[in-house]
């Protein structure tokens, strides 16, 4: 079976690249699939993730990321040029290698992938959720225009998604967000590493993990920790992630919690940091899935999380293996953290249950679901 994955880039540490690289490496190690990978960003630059040498790859060097810093009028012009080049190179490549299955991450190639007559089954796997995908928000434009452009984008997207052989979403919650589609299924992200150790949940330490961006809501977490700090000044919070952390360090100082809160860069031994912690906090405004939540829970660390769209409600069973609170409610987040701080027995019980509950996200189980999907697609090819 010949499978092509459209990855985009592996230049920066992020959830989607981590998940895709782990998935591709698993298939390379455990199957006899012939695997290909399409990249688009900055040929020649080092990757953040290692890829099994069995995987063949090509980098079209389109560099869509260059558009991020351009003004809108230039961005539109150069996007059209880059997209035209991308479509031609993508089409030529698929027509040359003739894969059995092409897996898109529902990025720029979704606009033309269904029109390529290479004979492959087309699968889309989205690493966002509908509520935050293809939103158009420009502060200098009227709200009605932003809504109009977003509506056009979604209409165009749905036309392409309906044509896919399968559309894979990450959560049951997001599954319900796509009522127009009859080709959708749920396959969650997997935990690629399941540790053989557990946290004691006895250290006076909470942890949060994610990029230093608006999405991850660390500004909300710091405000919540100010409330926690007033009751429990002996507890500390450590945040780990990539990106610019200076504004969060400034906010910590403004809130008076900088002595007990540290914003760290991303680390390679994050599981060791989980083990040293007793509470995991997810303060995201939205997620595609929230894999860090499951990873922390696999080490026996109970979580307090916003019930943001989408993922946490699929992972946490409130009051059983973690705590879910109203999305964006800073006081509720602080109360959930304080509840675990003040009840060590409850905290440890939730941690024990957390380890058990996330076993359903083990890599073997999730990749078996992908294998079944690929086999189903090939069976359909045989019958067609």
Question: For the regions a protein language model found, what residue spans apply to each?
Answer:
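Active-site proximal beta-strand in glycosyltransferases
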Residues: 3, 101-103, 116-136, 147
